[in-house]
Amino acid sequence: MFKGSIVAIVTPFKGGEVDEECYRELIEFQINNGTGAIVPCGTTGESATLSMTEHGRVIDIALDAVKGRIPVIAGAGGNSTQEAIQLTKHAKEAGADATLQVTPYYNKPTQEGLYQHFKSIADAVPLPQVIYNVPGRTGVNMLPETVARLAALPEVVAIKEASGNLGQMAEILNLAGDKITLLSGDDNLTLPVLALGGKGVISVIANIVPKDSADMVKAWEDRDISKAKELFYKLLPLSQAMFYESNPIPVKTSLSLMGRIDGEMRLPLAPMSSTNRERLAKVLKDYGLI
């Protein structure tokens, strides 16, 4: 369940509402191109701007569309432990295979606070957790020692690591590699993370090039290092372009330019600037996507 290219899928909007038909089409596109699992309602899915009702509905649509063909890892995190528990309960009741649990953001808990947060979710809902460290967004960095403590809990099975710190990721595996699966949280570090002992990536670029992302990880698994490197460096300009502006602005703009979604976002996310849109379009054109 926790390996390969896992897509942090966008949430398409149309006229201010979730575009269910388009969402289902995106999920089919992923499954047909080798994606290993779907993560609805993550950062890339604009979970922060979804109401609780919408959040639940997006998870339900994803599960109905996937129909058990690949795992669904439902985004269920929050900066309120009780809210995260509520979202996790819904994910379990709906039939999700696991949840993605981001470290609480804005309130900047201590390492003990982080441990108690994830433990409380595990105690309340017996469902596998992929814990998610992304200090650039949350304002708090979960240290390897804390991850190792959490790895002792049966529900905590994997970590999406987006600190950008390979030394920190190596220490996680050094302390708890036999108990927890490491997944890259950054497309531009997927190959280095695999080399450390990681098992895959929760990917943004898989939204637009799912097959190449999946093939890269598969090549590494097959010990075809040359092919894995070739695909990694082919993908690198796309990985970098996905952060010309805040995620998911570039990836939704890319999908719009490719004709797959409307490209609508919710405030406070605004449309991409014309300058960056031109830069992005060039990268997509060079890749052969438009």
Language model features with spans:
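Active-site beta->alpha loop and helix N-cap motifs at the rims of alpha/beta catalytic domains
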Residues: 1-7, 11-139
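C-terminal alpha-helical cap/extension of soluble enzyme domains
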Residues: 4-12, 29, 33-35, 195-198, ...
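Alpha-helix N-capping/helix-start residues
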Residues: 15, 20, 52, 144, ...
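A general structural signal for well-ordered alpha-helical segments in protein cores
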Residues: 23, 55, 59, 84, ...
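Short helix-capping segments at alpha-helix termini
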Residues: 64-70, 94-95, 125-127, 151-155, ...
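Catalytic alpha/beta core domains of metabolic enzymes, predominantly
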Residues: 123, 137-239, 243
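Glycine-rich phosphate-binding "P-loop"
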Residues: 133, 155-156, 266-267
